From Swiss-Prot:
This is Splenic IgW, short secretory form. GO terms for cellular component: extracellular region; immunoglobulin complex. Glycans are attached at residues 54, 179. PROSITE patterns: IG_LIKE, IG_MHC. Residues 53-145 form the Ig-like C1-type domain. It is found in: Secreted. InterPro entries: Ig-like_dom (IPR007110), Ig-like_dom_sf (IPR036179), Ig-like_fold (IPR013783), Ig/MHC_CS (IPR003006), Ig_C1-set (IPR003597), Immune_Resp_Modulators (IPR050380). Pfam families: C1-set. Keywords: Adaptive immunity, Disulfide bond, Glycoprotein, Immunity, Immunoglobulin, Immunoglobulin domain, Secreted. Expressed in pancreas, spleen, epigonal organ and at low levels in several other tissues. The keyword Secreted applies.
Length: 195
């Protein structure tokens, strides 16, 4: 039933319940409202798309590896809806990282960054760090491992065939002097702000 507000205008709501199977099958739902059939207002709803994320590792550039702490990161992009989980491990031991709030991109997918601050000495002696990412809506689960090697930076997705992820060709850089400004090797730049 319609409800009259303080401004003497009436408000009415309607709810459509659909099964999960129908929700996944149909891309659009429409709602029409009005006083008569010739003067209806229509609203159209698009079901949210489900898209799994891309993960890119961020490791210290050689210019910034001499400081007391190093920052490792994961850029997680292109996922929808906004429901992402990230965890960090050092040689299978849980670590406490930071996950920033997701940003909506122009294509209605989302991106975020997670980072872990570690002692530079641990990075230089070759400890292995792993960023684990899961996206429940798409059943996506993956990890990317990072390990320092003298003279090069290596970072390959877990399970990559040998020779498909050569060091220095795919690894982006995290530039510490701008904190959360990320420049990838292809020149693409991302700016992240802490909330």
């Amino acid at each position: 039933p319609a409800v009259q507000g303080n401004d003497k205008k009436y408000t009415m709501s309607s709810v459509l319940k659909v099964s999960a199977a129908d929700w996944k099958t149909n891309r659009f739902y429409q709602c029409q409202a009005g006083y008569n059939l010739n003067d209806m207002v229509e609203s159209r709803f698009e079901t949210p798309k489900i898209q799994e994320p891309n993960i890119t590792a961020l490791v210290p550039s050689v210019d910034f590896i001499s400081s007391q702490n190093a920052v490792l990161g994961c850029v997680i992009s292109g996922f929808a809806p906004d429901n992402i989980r990230v965890s960090w491990k050092k040689d299978q031991v849980d670590q406490t990282g930071v996950v920033l709030s997701s940003k909506r991109r122009t294509d209605n997918t989302f991106e975020t960054i997670s980072y872990l601050i570690i002692p530079t000495v641990n990075w230089k002696i070759g400890d292995k760090y792993t960023c684990e990412v899961s996206h429940p809506p798409s059943n996506f689960r993956s990890m990317i491992s990072m390990k320092y090697q003298e003279g090069e930076k290596s970072s390959c997705p877990s399970g990559s065939p040998p020779g498909t992820c050569p060091p220095c060709s795919l690894t982006p850089e995290l530039l510490y002097h701008t904190n959360l400004s990320v420049t990838l090797r292809n020149g693409e730049k991302h700016q992240y702000k802490c909330d």
